[in-house]
């Protein structure tokens, strides 16, 4: 990790929004279009389920994908700016939501955002959304990833401006907010622990446990056979 200063905390007040504004109802549904391709969907779901599995004992975060973030009553006019492909909010209640409504969430914005680039969204993700997340959301960490070209970049918010994250020797980028690395494996963006271990999905974890149980059973059978060769009944041990 090459970092000289910790990323800033996300905005946690509504100081940028006039107190005279009457906010619309908080029961707002997400207004996001379907994801562009099957690969985009796979990538978003992978980020969500891997983190939820890793943090399955935690109740103080919210991780979701392709969900609208309502931060201003005037926002609906900005049709060119959609919700993030994936974002994480820390220090909040882990529960199902129809959308993320900032003024109903104690002014909290995402701690981390990941955008999955595509030919139709890349320019917006690199420019308009980057500026939005930097200047309005003040999100401490912003990453983007192109599942086709494998372009991968990350930024820390330092002194109000996004600064590039330097990769480690494996090309992985460190997220201080998550306490994890992000890196590419077989064309997909994955999490890694601070020691470099891949964070598994629930399915991968179950498969590993099955394989480990099978190996233990095989080892036990070999040991039992060896004991019988020595005229020792393994059931009596």
Describe the role of every protein-language-model region:
Residues 2-32, 36, 53, 71-84, ...:
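C-terminal interaction segment
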Residues 57-72:
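A short acidic/basic microdomain associated with nuclease active sites
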Residues 62-64, 143-146:
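A structural signal for short, well-ordered beta-strand segments and their strand-loop junctions
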């Amino acid at each position: 990790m090459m970092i000289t200063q910790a990323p800033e905390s996300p905005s946690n007040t509504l100081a940028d929004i006039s107190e005279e504004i009457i906010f619309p109802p908080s029961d707002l549904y997400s207004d996001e279009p379907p994801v562009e391709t099957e690969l985009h969907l796979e990538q978003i779901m992978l980020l969500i389920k891997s983190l939820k599995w890793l943090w399955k004992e935690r109740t103080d975060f919210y991780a979701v994908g392709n969900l609208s973030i309502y931060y201003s009553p005037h926002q609906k006019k900005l049709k060119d700016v959609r919700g993030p492909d994936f974002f994480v909010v820390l220090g909040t209640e882990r529960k199902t939501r129809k959308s993320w409504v900032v003024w109903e969430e104690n002014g909290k914005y995402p701690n981390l955002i990941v955008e999955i680039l595509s030919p139709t969204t890349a320019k917006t993700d690199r420019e308009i959304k980057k500026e939005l997340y930097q200047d309005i959301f003040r999100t401490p960490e912003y990453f983007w990833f192109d599942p086709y070209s494998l372009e991968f970049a990350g930024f820390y918010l330092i002194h109000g401006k996004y600064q590039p994250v330097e990769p480690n020797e494996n090309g992985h980028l460190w997220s201080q907010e998550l306490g994890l690395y992000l890196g590419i494996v077989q064309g997909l963006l994955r999490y890694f622990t601070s020691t470099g271990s891949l964070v598994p999905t629930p399915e991968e974890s179950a498969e590993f446990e099955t394989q480990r149980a099978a190996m233990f059973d095989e080892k036990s059978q070999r040991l039992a056979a060896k004991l019988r060769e020595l005229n020792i009944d393994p059931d009596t041990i």
